[in-house]
Amino acid sequence: MVVEFKNEPGYDFSVQENVDMFKKALKDVEKELGQDIPLVINGEKIFKDDKIKSINPADTSQVIANASKATKQDVEDAFKAANEAYKSWKTWSANDRAELMLRVSAIIRRRKAEIAAIMVYEAGKPWDEAVGDAAEGIDFIEYYARSMMDLAQGKPVLDREGEHNKYFYKSIGTGVTIPPWNFPFAIMAGTTLAPVVAGNTVLLKPAEDTPYIAYKLMEILEEAGLPKGVVNFVPGDPKEIGDYLVDHKDTHFVTFTGSRATGTRIYERSAVVQEGQNFLKRVIAEMGGKDAIVVDENIDTDMAAEAIVTSAFGFSGQKCSACSRAIVHKDVYDEVLEKSIKLTKELTLGNTVDNTYMGPVINKKQFDKIKNYIEIGKEEGKLEQGGGTDDSKGYFVEPTIISGLKSKDRIMQEEIFGPVVGFVKVNDFDEAIEVANDTDYGLTGAVITNNREHWIKAVNEFDVGNLYLNRGCTSAVVGYHPFGGFKMSGTDAKTGSPDYLLHFLEQKVVSEMF
């Protein structure tokens, strides 16, 4: 009997025992850094001379791992392995596949501190964020396993005299998973193993910045007894193998989390039917956001400031759900801005091994991009707090607040993906919702209000996939807050939802006459 789903807890770091335990995990992980990691194709570990170097973004002199780089021929071999494995994997019962996934999650649970510690080094994640990432990975696997058990029952349809009908689900084939670096375990594990528990096989191309943590999942899958070829590990340069993976005639689906430019490219290329392809590809894409917190009049300004600061600067603003726009009613604008500045000054920035609140941004490209946007912000508005940058050892950007902006300013329109939040003043709630919707994106949003009519208006008109009342706009929880957005934020394939696995299944009807 499978127990009821419960979210995996984190660690309470106010308890010294947990602090000591995690410090030990960090030391143990550090001893293992710098090793070469292979491709994994049909269960075979293949080491290549050409490597992708993963480095610690907080200390660029520290090499995390050297990941073997897949070629197009390696990808072709991986497709052959996945197609062959699919022949038997699809015949496993849904319960057997789900039970194997529960074994995977149990192993991850035992290794949770190790997995989180790796993300502190490889992604620059603060302790709480890293542990939360590992826990969310467990949640996704556990949730999808139970979802598959439910879907295995099919859905009732009508019978009639002399005719019995069945409506059920079946897997669709081999697909490709392209996860992001910002949730390098949770999203990577969830988007890889959701199609797997549904009976499909996968080629996993990890993010170039975080291949080591993805390889750890491959180790765990092997330990759990996943058959060879069901998941194949092909790290590589997206310029070399990205289009090849997407275009391949055997790619039935692509799950992608990342930039708008890449997501729209994948969506476009997937629409082309290749020679030898006799199906239409499915794309499950999450492409970021320009998320806003709307602050109404007559509210708790302390709560509003805390919601803005935690949502804007948690994990250095490197969440697709991060608050990058604060849209504040004129009557409380100055007070909310002042309190937000005060809270921001209290945040610690540094190497997250030392348990700072904020760490580095992920790489030099992102560092330069964010630095440029801060300069743009200085021209468009007023720099109120932060703005400093330092890449002498790692890629550090101070939490930055820019005020006096207008809705059409670049700081308010373009995704920055860093610790920068812009403030705009509005005259009333109607204008606030207009400004909130004045973007190509529609992922998350929050409204701070005590006015029920205003909240109902936001529910009906604030055009985002995930909307929150009187809290920040980040920290969706699997099972509670299915996650996905509208417009250019993606295909709104809600992760952690009862419907998510349907993207990897076909519906079949069988009618039997008597």
Swiss-Prot record:
Disulfide bond recorded as keyword: no
Source organism per UniProt: Staphylococcus aureus (strain NCTC 8325 / PS 47)
Enzyme class: oxidoreductase
Active-site annotation: E286, C320
Record field: catalytic activity: L-glutamate 5-semialdehyde + NAD(+) + H2O = L-glutamate + NADH + 2 H(+)
GO annotation, biological process: glutamate biosynthetic process; proline catabolic process to glutamate
Lineage of the species this protein comes from: Bacteria, Bacillati, Bacillota, Bacilli, Bacillales
InterPro entries the record matches: Ald_DH/histidinol_DH, Ald_DH_C, Ald_DH_CS_CYS, Ald_DH_CS_GLU, Ald_DH_N, Aldehyde_DH_dom, Proline_metab_enzyme, RocA
Assigned protein family: Belongs to the aldehyde dehydrogenase family. RocA subfamily.
GO CC terms in record: cytoplasmic side of plasma membrane
EC number: 1.2.1.88
UniProt entry tagged with the keyword Oxidoreductase: yes
Superkingdom: Bacteria
Alphabetized UniProt keyword annotations: NAD, Oxidoreductase
Protein name: 1-pyrroline-5-carboxylate dehydrogenase
Pathway annotation: Amino-acid degradation; L-proline degradation into L-glutamate; L-glutamate from L-proline: step 2/2
CDD domains referenced in this protein's UniProt entry, alphabetically: ALDH_PutA-P5CDH-RocA
Classification via Pfam families: Aldedh
GO molecular function: 1-pyrroline-5-carboxylate dehydrogenase activity
